Amino acid sequence: MSIDRKKVEEHIRGLLVAIGENPDREGLKETPSRVAQMYQEVFEGISYTNDEIAEMFNKTFEEDLVIPKDNKEIVLVKDIDIFSYCEHHMALMYNMKVAVAYIPNDKILGLSKIARIADMVGKRLQLQERIGSDIAEIMQKITDSEDVAVIVEGQHACMTTRGIKNTGSRTTTTTLRGAFKTDTNLTNRLMMLYK
């Protein structure tokens, strides 16, 4: 599903009128078009399913890779910067850092692809918890590894700029799959690497 820029422009113009603004004044004349263009970029991930994202970034390396059957070595990419928008208020989720870990099975994924997956998943109306589970699902599909962990930290404008207005709060969510969920020693190793 692609974004209907024309409809977005019409609705943004209507929203400006509804909040008491004049959409024809100098500073707002191009706002509906600018917002539509911005939404096309920041909500790009809405256009793709998790399967399509997995296919898009499925660049694995298998040649010259010798992985023992009992492998418990962790690949961790952390401090991946993303942003998203809360699906409840359409408010920005910002200062987000994502960490993605997996235990290679028969494939390793190009590291930049992990960051691209996190970025694309964030470009949807989201819940922070779902960002983690979507990334984990995509990683499992690409790597054929059940052992995936995702940690997401971020701030939510729906908490910092409205309601309670708690500007210092950060939310951390974890998604643990496979051995990361069942093996306490492995989970502890992950958390030590994550710090």
Curated annotation (Swiss-Prot):
Its EC number is 3.5.4.16. Pathway: Cofactor biosynthesis; 7,8-dihydroneopterin triphosphate biosynthesis; 7,8-dihydroneopterin triphosphate from GTP: step 1/1. It is an enzyme of class 3 (hydrolase). GO terms for biological process: one-carbon metabolic process; tetrahydrobiopterin biosynthetic process; tetrahydrofolate biosynthetic process. It catalyses: GTP + H2O = 7,8-dihydroneopterin 3'-triphosphate + formate + H(+). InterPro entries: GTP-CH-I_C/QueF (IPR043133), GTP-CH-I_N (IPR043134), GTP_CycHdrlase_I (IPR001474), GTP_CycHdrlase_I_CS (IPR018234), GTP_CycHdrlase_I_dom (IPR020602). Keywords: GTP-binding, Hydrolase, Metal-binding, Nucleotide-binding, One-carbon metabolism, Zinc. Gene3D superfamilies: 1.10.286.10, 3.30.1130.10. It comes from the Bacteria. Pfam families: GTP_cyclohydroI (PF01227). Transmembrane segments: none annotated. Homomer. Belongs to the GTP cyclohydrolase I family. NCBIfam families: folE, PRK09347.1-2, PRK09347.1-3. This is GTP cyclohydrolase 1. It comes from Ruminiclostridium cellulolyticum (strain ATCC 35319 / DSM 5812 / JCM 6584 / H10) (Clostridium cellulolyticum). The gene is folE.
